[in-house]
Structure formats: C-alpha cells, structure tokens
Amino acid sequence: MKQLLIALVILTTTACGWHLRGITKLPATVQVMTLESQANTRFTERLKQQLIFNGVVFPSDASANVRLMIAPIHIERLTLSVNSRGQAAEYELNAELKVRLIQLEEGTDTEWNLSGRRIFSNDINSVIATQSEEKVQRQELENDLIRKLMNRLKKAQLK
C-alpha cells in the first residue's frame, strides 16, 4: 500500500509539470558551448554552475558551435522615497544584462537584454544593516538574471 501511494504521488507531481526550481531542460543545440563573460567573477561562476547543472558541456578546445557572450552587469541604485527629514527611506536597484548567443557555423546571432528590479528599505539607524541588505538584494538580482537567461536559452530557436 505504501509503495502504491508513493507511486501515485510521483505520477501526480510529474503529470502536473512540477519540477525542482533551477532545473531547466535546455535544447540540444545549446548543450555544448563556450562561455565568454565580462561580468563579475561571482556571477560568472554561478552562471557556469547553473549551466553545468542543466547539462551544458564546456569543451576545453574551441570545438563548440555555440558561444554565449555575457557583457558586464550594470546595476544602478536609485533613491525611491525619502522620509520627513529628507533622508532616503527606500532604494531601488535596477539591473541590466546584455547577452549574445552566437551560432558560429550557421552565422546566427541572437541578442537579449535582460533586466531586473529590487526594492529595499534604508534603516537610517543602522548603516551596516542597510549595506548588508543591499548586498543580499544585489545577489538575488543576479540570481534573477541567471534564471531569466536560463529561460531564454530554453526557448532559443537555433538550427
């Protein structure tokens, strides 16, 4: 009976399309690629780790037909609101990432502009807490950009 219940739960979750977060089935055309990134090292390593986790292989030679080029991430911090004393009460982080997916043999070049936005409060009594929160929000913003890029790669129409 217990085995039947486990089998039923597994069938139900797979039939409804549920899957673990971060797992993206990428098309075969992007399973072997080279990665050229001008983004910061932390972002590049997390992106590479996510790609490897989803089955992408990075050959040591130049044999890959697909090249993924990542421009530097541009993150801008804006004051969103101020308190009654004229001090910043909330900040907004806006991120933009330019990505190019090039298929060398076919000569196709696809460019994407990915963006993200985060809002966080400014604790005027604790500068360290605000700096810590900004750091966390920047990391989450980068994670959002990686997820968006993985979704774009999933839907990439390459030959």
What is the predicted function of each stretch?
Residues 12-15:
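C-terminal motif of bacterial Sec signal peptides marking the signal peptidase cleavage site
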Residues 40, 44, 90-94, 134-142, ...:
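Solvent-exposed, acidic/flexible segments
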Residues 1-5:
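Positively charged n-region of N-terminal signal peptides that target proteins for export
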Residues 51, 55, 101, 105, ...:
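Sec/Tat-exported extracytoplasmic proteins
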Residues 128-159:
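C-terminal/domain-edge helix-coil "capping" segments
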Residues 29-74:
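N-terminal segment of the mature soluble domain
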Residues 54, 69-113, 118-131, 135:
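Surface-exposed short loop/turn segments
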Residues 17-20:
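Bacterial signal peptide processing site
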